[in-house]
Structure formats: C-alpha cells, structure tokens
Amino acid sequence: MIVGIGIDIVYIPRILNLWKKFGNKFLKKVFSQEEIKDSNKYTSCEGKARHFAKRFAAKEAYVKALGTGFGKSIKMSDITTYNTLYGKPQITVKKSNIDYKAELSLSDDTDYAIAFIILHKES
C-alpha cells in the first residue's frame, strides 16, 4: 500500500554556492558522514556538487512523502542516500521508527537534480 509520494528538484549551482560559502559546516549540517565520504569518488567540485544536489533532493522528497517536513523528529543529516552495488539508489533514516519501504529514483541534467520517491508498506 502506498503511503506517500514525494518529488523535489534542486538547482545544482545553488548547492555549489552554499558549499563554497559555508564549507564543511554546510556539508555536516545537511549530509550524513556516509554521503560526505561517498562524494570522494568524484574528483571535481562539479561532480561533488551533483552528488550532493541529488542527495539534497532525495531528503526533501522523502519528508514530502512522509508529509512531515523537517523538524525536531528528523534532520537532514539523519537521512542517508546511497547506491547499491548495482547502482540502485536507496535511502535510510537514523533514529527512526518509520517502517516504510522506499522506491527512490535520482537524476540530474545540466543545472538540475531531481528525486522521486514512493513510500509503501509491505502487505
């Protein structure tokens, strides 16, 4: 049973500008340690910015699907987006008792990154 659908689009240069302006403080506030570490596979700032923009969009899409937004119960850095060995994007949430499965799709082109997520309960 589907319990929520979320979508978000991010302007990649915005993420790059925030990163340049606030540095690691921005990264640590928004992204998990795993996401920051995973960005090291990219050698260019632009590649890293695409990586972070897709994960930013995934976090926003996730809380939209939940219908809660960010707040006391969930912070951006509590959410981790990663890829399986086969490249499929996955999402996990620390300190959460939410028991939904997530189907996540990420994409980027030119200056934009997008995330689409479906949350569902297993029958």
Curated annotation (Swiss-Prot):
InterPro entries: 4-PPantetheinyl_Trfase_dom, 4-PPantetheinyl_Trfase_dom_sf, ACPS, P-Pant_transferase_sf, Ppantetheine-prot_Trfase_dom. It is found in: Cytoplasm. Gene3D superfamilies: 4'-phosphopantetheinyl transferase domain (3.90.470.20). It catalyses: apo-[ACP] + CoA = holo-[ACP] + adenosine 3',5'-bisphosphate + H(+). Keywords: Cytoplasm, Fatty acid biosynthesis, Fatty acid metabolism, Lipid biosynthesis, Lipid metabolism, Magnesium, Metal-binding, Transferase. Transmembrane segments: none annotated. It comes from the Bacteria. The keyword Kinase does not apply. One of its GO terms (cellular component) is cytosol. Mg(2+) binds at residues 8, 60. GO terms for biological process: fatty acid biosynthetic process; lysine biosynthetic process via aminoadipic acid. GO terms for molecular function: holo-[acyl-carrier-protein] synthase activity; magnesium ion binding. Its cofactor is Mg(2+). Its EC number is 2.7.8.7. Transfers the 4'-phosphopantetheine moiety from coenzyme A to a Ser of acyl-carrier-protein. HAMAP family: AcpS. Belongs to the P-Pant transferase superfamily. AcpS family. PANTHER family: L-AMINOADIPATE-SEMIALDEHYDE DEHYDROGENASE-PHOSPHOPANTETHEINYL TRANSFERASE, PHOSPHOPANTETHEINE TRANSFERASE. This is Holo-[acyl-carrier-protein] synthase. It comes from Ehrlichia ruminantium (strain Welgevonden).
